[in-house]
Amino acid sequence: MILNAKFLISASKIDEAPQPIYTEIAFLGRSNVGKSSLINTLCKNKNLAKSSSTPGKTQLINFFEVDCKKDEDKFKLIFIDLPGFGYAKVSKKTKAIWNKNLDEFLKERSSIKLFIHLIDSRHENLDIDLNLDLYLDSFIRADQKKITVFTKADKLNQSQKAKLLNANKNAILVSNLKKSGIDKLEQKIILESLGFNEE
């Protein structure tokens, strides 16, 4: 389980990132999908990661040190809140630099062991998410894994939820508002981080 967490540092590129010490978990998805809010819910601290209703607000790579426990063992993880893909009120030049820095960070940061791809459950097949999935698959290593998480589950009815999960067998459906699916995701993160595999 996650005990608590604290903000470490913000970085705009890999050179500014802290030296990797612990296993890292990267949260990524399109803008305004709820990455910061999910990190806050998982860490039981609504003020930890700064979330905003304005798409593209998170323009830096933010690192959080997370204290965890499984049985009697305590350990630390690093959660990484990444800038949202696909939307930002910035110039084309700034966006190009930003995308280059993100690409370099994701491909070269070998301490990232788990990618959590967040998708708005109401819009499951957008090109940006399909492309992000293909992008991750293009470089993900044998010692890395990917979890698909559908957010904003409270916006769906029961039949919509069932249909979504039926089409995406290994995905997890969460709602920050209702706190549903959070425990399941938390357990999955802990197990994967420790090298366990539930399947």
From Swiss-Prot:
Its cofactor is Mg(2+). Mg(2+) binds at residues 36, 58. The keyword Cell inner membrane does not apply. Residues 21-195 form the EngB-type G domain. GO terms for biological process: division septum assembly. Keywords: Cell cycle, Cell division, GTP-binding, Magnesium, Metal-binding, Nucleotide-binding, Septation. Belongs to the TRAFAC class TrmE-Era-EngA-EngB-Septin-like GTPase superfamily. EngB GTPase family. Necessary for normal cell division and for the maintenance of normal septation. This is Probable GTP-binding protein EngB. It comes from Campylobacter lari (strain RM2100 / D67 / ATCC BAA-1060). The gene is engB.
